C-alpha cells in the first residue's frame, strides 16, 4: 500500500463496540469520530503486510500486530489511549483542530486528522516527512503509561494525531526525539491553557453574566464553567492526563447534546460557543499529551478487537481497508451516525451560526406564548413554607394538574437568596430522572417567582412515618434504594442536595419516591465518570468551602457543623439518618437546640434498638457506614456504587425498582385531593399576603430572567392540548393566578406543588439556616416547630411534630369547620357529607401500608364494646400487614392523635390534622380513638375531608375505623339540663393485635329528648363533636367536649354498619391491651433527655404509642396551648383529643398534678380531653400501658419526661371532658384530674416533675372549682400520705392511683362539682365520686360537701399538696360558711380547683356546705335524695360555662352509706379513714357511658360497694345499674382494672365512669360485669 493512501486514511473512525472496549466519539463532534490512521498504501488490496495494521486489516488473526515483532515494518503502533479511550484530539465542533491556527478548510478539519498541527508539520506533509514520523513511531516502545485512570464511559479507540506511516527502519531514536519535542512544548502549551482557562472562567462565570432564562441551559452554563475551573485546578496540580482530557471532552459533548435535545431556547447558541471556546483552549495541550502518552501496543489490541467486532457483527461487507475508508468518511458520504450538530455546522466547526439558526428554527417552530400565571387556575393550597406556598393548579387549556410553587420575591431579596431560587429552577428543569421531581416551566409575577412542577399526590415520607411509625424493612429498603438512585443521578451532575430528609421524599401515586426541594442545593462539578485520580475523594469531600451551615439540623453532617468544607458525602450522611428513621421511627440524634443536637451528632454514639425492635444486621452496618463522622471514609464518598453494593441490597434489582409493587399506595378521593399534605397555614400565611404588597421597583435585574419553559412542558402541553380539545374546560378559580401564560405553566406548577407539598413548600423553609425562619424550628418552644416547620427543632422533627397541637393544624380549616359546626347538623340519618365520606376513604388510601381494614378488624374484634356492629371493614384495610398496623398504631398514637384532631376540625370547625405536619393521618377521634383501625380512620369521611392534606386522611395516619359515610353534624339543642342521649366509649382493636383505639358510640337516646329530635340514633358511631374528631379521645375528653359546648352541641355520627369496625367476642387478654398512641408525639426534648439512658427504640416503637421522640417537649406544650381555645369553641374541645391532650396525658404531668399539667401542654388546654383523660385510668389496657408509658417517658431523650403529657389514649378518660365548656379562664392544665390521669395510667408511678405554676394556663372556673374541691378532699384525706395528692410529686404509686381517681379535672362538671371527696376522719367514710361517662355523677352536690356535717367546714387542701401536685402553691380563698361547701376559689393564684378525692386528714369531720347551687350542683342536688336513697333522678345539669372566679355552691344532702351507694344517690357516704399509703381506688369500668340526658352525680364510696358492678355511666333513663361504690371524682380507670368483658370497643381510657371502684385498687368483681 502506498504511504499516500494511508496518509489519506488519517480520519479513522471506529464503530462503537459492545464491550466498551473502543471509544466512540459522541456524535456532536465530528472529529471525535475520526481516528488518525496513517496508512502507507493507497490500495486496500495491496498485500496486508505493508499495511500499518496487518493484523487488523488481514483476515487472519495470525496477522494481528502481536504476531509481528516491533521492528517488523508492517507493525505500526497506533496511538491508542491505553484505555479504550485512546482517541485523537481533533475536536469536530471546534473551529480549529488544536493549535489555534485554522485548518485550511473547516471541512478538512472535520474530516481529516489534524496530525499536521499536532506535529507542527506543514499542512500537507511530504512523504519523506511522514516517513520520518513513521520511524519515530514505529517502535512498540510505549510512552509512559498514564493508564491509571478509568476508562471514559464511551470507549473509542482512536489513533493518535501522530500516526506516521511505517518504515522498516528502527525509530527508537526518533521517538525519543519526538517525545522530547512534546515534553518541551507541553509546558508552554499548558501555561497558555491555564491562562486562557482563568480568563474564560472569569469572563463567563454565572455570577458575571445574566442568568440564562432557560433552566436547562443555565445549568449547562454552570457546568461548563465548573469544568473549566476543574481543568485549571488539575493542571496546576499536575493531575492532568490524556484520560482526563477525554473525559472532559465527553462531558462537554454530553452537555452540548443535552442543550440541543432539551432546550428550545435561542440561548443554545451561547452555550455552544462556550463549549467551542473551551475545547479550543484545551485542544493543543490535549493533543500534545496524547502524543506523549501514546501506547502503540494498546492501540493495536484495540484495533484488533474492533476488527473482530466488525466481522462478527457483519458490519464489514467488504475488505477491511474499504471498510475503514468508508468509516472514516473518506468517500465523502455523509455520516449517517453523526449528530446533526455536525451537519448543522455544515462541515465547519467554525460555523456556529448554523447551529444557532437551526436551534433557533427548532425553538421558533415550537415557540408558544411563554407561560404565565393566567394560564393556570389555582385549585387549592398544598402547603406553606418559609419562602412561599405551593398550590395545586390546573392548566386552563390542558386541564392538567400541576404544583405551583410561589416564592415571594421580597423574601428572596431580603435574604439575598435570589441566586438560590435560580439554582433550584435550573436543577429541577435539567433533571430528568424518574426519582426526581420534574419542573415544567417557571415565570415571574409582580409579587412572586413561580415554578410549575409535577404534582406528586402521596405526600412525603415524613408524614408517612408519623402515621405508621417505623417502616417495614422491605418498604424502607425500596424507598431508600430509590432515593439512592436519585442521589446518584444528582451527584453525577455535581448537584449536592444538602437538605435530604423524609420531608423531601415524595410518594407518587404508584407508591414510588421522588426527590424534591432543591432550594438549598449546590451545583458543583459534574462527574459522569468514576474519578480514580489520587485525592479525588478528599477533594470531593471538601468541594464547597463556604462554611455555610444549612439544612435541617437532624440531618446535617458533622463536617458542615464543624465548617470544614463539605461535598457530596453530606448527602450520604443524611441518607444514613433517613434509613435509621425509616427503620426505627425517629432520628438517631435529638436536641432541644441546634447546638445540643450538633453536639450529639459530633460526639455521640448511635443508640440501636434491641430485642424485638433490633434492626437487621446488614441494615445496621449500612447505617453505621453512612454515619461515619469522617467524610473520607463514609460509605458513598467514592460514589453511589459503594452504597449499591452493600449487602443490605443483596437481593435488590436496581434496574427494576420502578416495576416493583409498592406497599403503600396513596388513595385519593379525587384528582384534586391534597389531603396527604399539610398546609401549615398556622405557621405561614403567604396566602393572605401574596398579592397585597407591591413589589419593590428596585428588584434585581436577574429576576426578569426567571421565566422559562422546559421541553417536557411543551410535550405535555401539545399532547394535553389535543386531549383537552375534547374535554369540557372547567377552569378552577385561579386564586392569585394572574393570567399570563397558560401553556408552559401547568406542568411546572405541578412539580413545584409536589415538591412543596412534601415536607414544606421549599427546602429553605424546611431547612434550618441561621437567621432564617427555619431556625425557629430549633427554638426551645416546640410549639413553633409544631406549628408547621417541616423540620422541627432537632429532636422535634416534623415527624415528632405530630405532637403539634391540633388547633394549629386545624387552623387552616378552622373557619370552614366552625362554620359547619355552627350550621345545624343534619340529622344523624343523613349520609355523611361527601367530604366526610371522602375523608375516611382518603385516610385509608393515604396509608396504603397500614390498611384501615386491619384497624377495622381490630375494632371489630371488640364487638361487645361497640354497641352496633360495623358492617364491613375497609376494603383497603387488609392491605397493611398486621405488623405494620401495629407499628403504625404505635406511631399514630403519638402522631395519629394529632392527625385525628386535625381532621375532625375540618368536619367540626377545625381541621384536625395530624398534630404534626408530619403526621399524615387525621383521626376521627370520636369514632375510632386509636384502637380503631388506624388505616381505616383515614377512611372516615370527616377526617379526610377535614384535613386539607391527604396525609391527615391517609389511613396510616388514622386509627379510626374506616367510615364510609359521615352524616352532617347533628346539632342538639339542650332542653333544660339534658341532651337526652347516653354515649359510651368502646375499644376498637386493630386486627388481632392488642392495640386498640377508643371510639364512642351513642348508647342510648332518650325518647322525646333533644337528641332524638335532632335525629341522633342509638348505635351510631360518634366521629366528631363540635367539629372536632373524637376518635382516640378518651371518654372524659369527649364528655368534656360535649359539656363545654354550652346549650348546643354538634355531633357528627355515622351508622356503625358503615364503619369498618366489626363486633367480636370480648378479648380475654384485654389486660394486655394497649391503647393505640394518639397522634401526639412526645416532645422531642423529653425524648432527648432520656435518649441516652433509655432505649431509643423502646421510646419510638413502643412508647411511641404515647409519645414521639421526634419533637421537643416545647412543641407539645405549644400544641396544648394552641389547642386551648375558648371554652365554647369547637377548637377548645379539640384539644381534648388533640395531641396536646396527649401530651397532657403524659403520666408525668398527671403526677405533677394540675399545676404540672398546666405547665405541660395539656394543662394549657383547659378542657382538653387529654387532661380529663389523665384523671381516669383506662381499663386494664391502659393499665398495662401505664407502666410502659412511664418508662417510656423517662427513657425518652426529652429532657423532661414530665413535660410530655401522656397521649390521650394513654390517659384514662375523665368525665371532665363531658363537663360543660370550661370557663374562658379555665385551662386544661388547671384541672388536676387532667394531669393526674397519666399517673394513674401507669402501673409504676411516673416520674413526677413539678411544673411552674406560671406555666399553667388559666383554668376554667368550673374545672378550678372541681379541682379545688378535689384538693380539699385530698387534703382532708391527707392522713394517707401527708395529704400529698397525685398532684404532689411525692405520691406513691398506689396513692398516685388513688389520687388519680380522686382528681376531677377530667370529670364532667357535674362530677367535679359534686364530687368533692369527704374529709376522712377516723370514722368518716371516704366519699367516692362516681362519674358516669355520659352524666356527671357525683355523690356530692356541687355546692355541698356531702360528707361534711352541716356547719362543719371542710379544711382547705394543704398548700403542700397543691404545690407538690403542682396545682398551686397558694391556697385560694374558700367560702366556708356552714351549710355551704368549702370551695377553693381562684384568688389571683392559678390553681386547679379539683375536688380532692383522697382521704382528708383523719378526724376531720366533713360538713355539707350549702350554698348557691352551680348547675352541676343543682343537678347533683336534684338527683340526691335523702342519704341512702339511690335512684332519685338527678336534676338535669344545665351546662353553662361558669364565669371564671365565680363559684356556685349548693347544699347537698349527704349520703351516709359508708359502703357506697347502690344507686347513684345525692348523698355521699362517709368513707372510713384508710391508710393513705395503701389505699388506692381502682375504677372498674364495665363500660363507660355518659348519659347526656340527665346528668346527675352519683356518689361512690371508697369501699367496695355491695354492687361494684353498678355502672356509673348508666344513662339517665332507667338503665339497669348495679349499686357500685362511687368512684372518687377524679378517679380514672386504674391500671389493672378490667374493661367490661365483651365490650371490645370500650376504651380502656374510658374508665371515666367505671361502675366499681375498689379501694384496694383491684377491680371489684361486680364492676367487671356488664
Swiss-Prot record:
Organs and tissues of expression: Expressed in the brain. Expressed in the developing cortical plate, the intermediate zone and corpus callosal fibers that cross the midline. Detected at low levels in the testis, liver and spleen. Expressed in proximity to neuronal nuclei throughout the cortex and cerebellum, and in the vascular endothelium. Also detected in ependymal cells, the choroid plexus, and in developing spermatid acrosomes.
Membrane topology annotation: Peripheral membrane protein
Swiss-Prot/TrEMBL GO biological process terms: brain development; cytoskeleton organization; intracellular signal transduction; protein phosphorylation
The PDZ domain, residue ranges: 968-1056
Top enzyme category: transferase
Disrupted-gene phenotype: Knockout mice do not show morphological defects.
Modified residue annotations for Phosphoserine: 90, 139, 167, 346, 689, 895, 954, 1414
Protein name, per record: Microtubule-associated serine/threonine-protein kinase 1
Biased composition (Low complexity): 105-114, 151-170, 864-878, 933-961, 1104-1132, 1149-1174, 1519-1535
Domain Protein kinase: 375-648
Chief place where the protein resides: membrane
Lineage start: Eukaryota, Metazoa, Chordata, Craniata, Vertebrata
Segments forming domain AGC-kinase C-terminal: 650-721
Biased amino acid composition, Basic residues: 1069-1082
GO cellular component: axon; cytoplasm; cytoskeleton; dendrite; membrane; neuron projection; neuronal cell body; plasma membrane
